[in-house]
Structures are given as C-alpha cells and as structure tokens.
Design a protein with these regions (language model features):
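Short helices/loops that flank or line small-molecule/ion binding pockets
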Residues: 6-7, 56-57, 77-113
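Short beta-strand->loop
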Residues: 11-18, 89, 109, 114-135
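Short amphipathic alpha-helical coupling segments at ligand-binding clamshell hinges
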Residues: 38-40, 150-161, 170
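A bilobed periplasmic-binding-protein/Venus flytrap-type ligand-binding module shared by bacterial periplasmic
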Residues: 22-33, 138-154
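A conserved helix-loop-strand patch within extracytoplasmic ligand-binding domains
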Residues: 11-64, 168
C-alpha cells in the first residue's frame, strides 16, 4: 500500500487490520526443501513486496541469507549467501502458478494458490510463518479509507462488524485454513 501511495499520490490511511495470508513455495518436482539441488531455479513474484517475502521465507528456512539492512523487502541482488547457487526468476504474481512445470519451485501468493487448487497447509513445500500476535509485519492486509475520512462513523461500524468472532471463524476456514485473522475479538 505504501508503494502505491508513493507512486500515485493517494491520500489513504489504514483503518483496521483484517488478516494475514502467508505466501508459500509450491513445486511439482520437490516435496521438501532439502531436495533442492545446486543451480535449481525458483520463481518469485516480480513485485518488490512479495518477491522480498519469498526471499525472507527461504532465509528463515536457512536456504539463503540476505543483507539485513534491506529489512522486510530484500531483492535478489541483496542475497549475501546462496550455497546452492539457486537461480531466481521474477514473474508477475498472478502468473507464478503457471510456471510449476518449467521451474523447480515457485512462490505463489495465497489467493492465487487457492484459486488453482492448492491448500497452503497441505501443499506448500514451505511457507511464511506469520502470527496474529505479531502485526508488525508489513504484509498484514488492511482496510483503508481516504485519510480525511478515516474517523467517520460508518467506518467504525464496519470495523466493529468485521473484527468479530464470526468473521474470525470464516477467515480461519477460508482457503483451506491458511488465512490468519489479524485482530482480537
């Protein structure tokens, strides 16, 4: 969102957290990370946010290391250690699922994975480890409004209705149980 605001000059403000949707790595060629071989090619989303998330997942799993000064959004050029000499191919996020026949693995956003029959909890080789207790991640989904309107009564009602036990139950069942409510109820 911050990138969109910067690029287009939108005057938006987050009004509430909604849910977390972990990105996952999927493959038709491997089932576990330890099956990766030297020189394998991994597809990551081409947008900076999701590409960075993908690299951070591999870093958390001990596959690569990135320059810590890049924070939450490292790029391929920020990889400081890559013992398997993995090749990273950037593809439009909506198209990453189409690459599974051609590459060792692909990082696929949760919504695209689910739309194509994948269940993150069952099918991902590895996935982002997100917690509803840590909302400092820049990858939490938010509802936004125009900055000048964020305090309007209608939005207070929307937030109250959305951040409810019923909504949390629906989210926990969505996408095969992959979504994580990002609010307390």
């Amino acid at each position: 969102m911050n990138q969109e605001i910067k690029e287009h000059g939108y005057k938006l403000a987050p009004i509430c957290y909604t849910y977390l949707d972990p990105i996952g790595m999927y493959s038709k060629k491997i089932k576990r990370l330890d099956e990766l071989k030297k020189g394998d090619s991994i597809v990551i989303p081409s947008d900076p946010s999701n590409g960075g998330r993908s690299l951070l997942v591999l870093e958390a799993e001990g596959v690569i290391k990135t320059n810590v000064s890049k924070g939450q959004i490292p790029d391929v050029g920020d990889i400081t250690e890559n013992k398997l000499e993995l090749n990273f191919v950037k593809i439009n996020p909506a198209d990453t699922v189409k690459t599974l026949d051609d590459y060792t693995a692909a990082f696929i956003n949760g919504n695209y994975a689910f739309e194509n029959g994948f269940i993150a909890n069952r099918d991902a080789v590895c996935r982002e480890k997100l917690s509803p207790d840590d909302l400092s991640t820049p990858f939490v989904k938010v509802l936004v409004a125009r900055a000048k309107d964020q305090g309007r009564a209608v939005f207070i009602k929307v937030i109250s209705a959305y951040q409810s036990k019923g909504s949390a139950q629906v989210l926990k069942q969505a996408e095969g149980g992959a979504l994580i409510p990002a609010f307390t109820y």
